[in-house]
Amino acid sequence: MKKITLIALVIFILFTGCKKNTSTVSQIPDEVQAIIQRSCASNEVLLRQLAEDPSLKSRMDEIESFTRRTIASVETRRLVNGVIEIPVVVNLIYRTAEENISDAQIQSQIDVMNADFNAANRDVRQVPSLFTASIGSTGLKFVLIKINRRATDVVSWGTNDAMKFTRRGGIDATDPPHNLNMWVCNLGQYLGYSYYPGIRDAIDGVVILYSAFGSRAIYRNGTYLNKYDLGRTVDHEVGHWMNLHHIWGDDGGSCNGSDLVDDTPNQGAENYGCPSFPHISCSNNGDMSMNYMDYTDDACMYMFSKGQAQRMLAVFAPGGPRALIGQ
């Protein structure tokens, strides 16, 4: 997708935010609003942090400049025995037995990420021939090092980061400069949200709806939300945590936005459900709707691009915003 500056992207997000699509259905617990289309709150929480922390924008601009320099110099990899290990801490906050998902369901999410971020998922074979040469692999290995659990009376946490603080009924992050912290809880209308690199340590990490965490294909006896039961919501949000933007550039269909990646096609807007290929927008040869950074159902997203892989790896390079992860 054509490049624009991070400044322009943030300015556009200030006017568009992150789309939500929800409706109530009686077939699932009352406290989980039926999510008929994927939604994330990453841009919404970014806007709030930009308003609360005037220095964040300059830090993000510096990170973007570093990312471009690092990719251009082909110095994106910080490999140890061929991989970069990402220690993962899962902070599970639950009110009901249903929300208190099992260790096996949690491990299934780690297994999904280790496949998906390395193009080792079986469904990557479904990528259209137009994009097969663009399939990206990162060399990342996610390692579950700790599960923290806490019971709560809170019905739904929302996006105000309260779940990230013990004093507010949540769980404090575990050594965030060195670990990927994930908070799993009831988020109501949202599947999840995440922060881009540059945010303050105390709130850095990924937040996921408990029933969108893990994979039914790996562990069938878990608590899952239909259409979002293969672990791809976490792929999407961890992509944000590694500095990826939505593939359509959050431009509301104008074809003027960008995800700041060269090998993803210009795309007019987000895709939902399981669109038939090609879905053409912005005079492209077909949207890369199967990309994890789109909004399709879990079963219909199964790739990152090579350019996205480079962008993610850049955050771990020496001097990068996540260079201390795993160190």
What is each model feature region?
Residues K2-L9:
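Sec-dependent signal peptide recognition
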Residues L14-G17:
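C-terminal motif of bacterial Sec signal peptides marking the signal peptidase cleavage site
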Residues S23-S26, T264-Q327:
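Metalloprotease/metallohydrolase-associated module, dominated by Zn2+-dependent proteases
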Residues T24-P176, P321:
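Propeptide-to-catalytic entry region of secreted or membrane-anchored zinc metalloproteases
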Residues V90-Y94, A212, D297:
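Short, histidine-centered active-site or binding-site loop motifs used for metal coordination
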Residues A97-N100, Y224-D229, T296-M303:
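Active-site rim elements
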Residues S102-Q109, L230-V234, S305-R311:
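Stable alpha-helical elements in mature extracytoplasmic
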Residues D111-G273:
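Metzincin-family zinc-dependent endopeptidase catalytic domain
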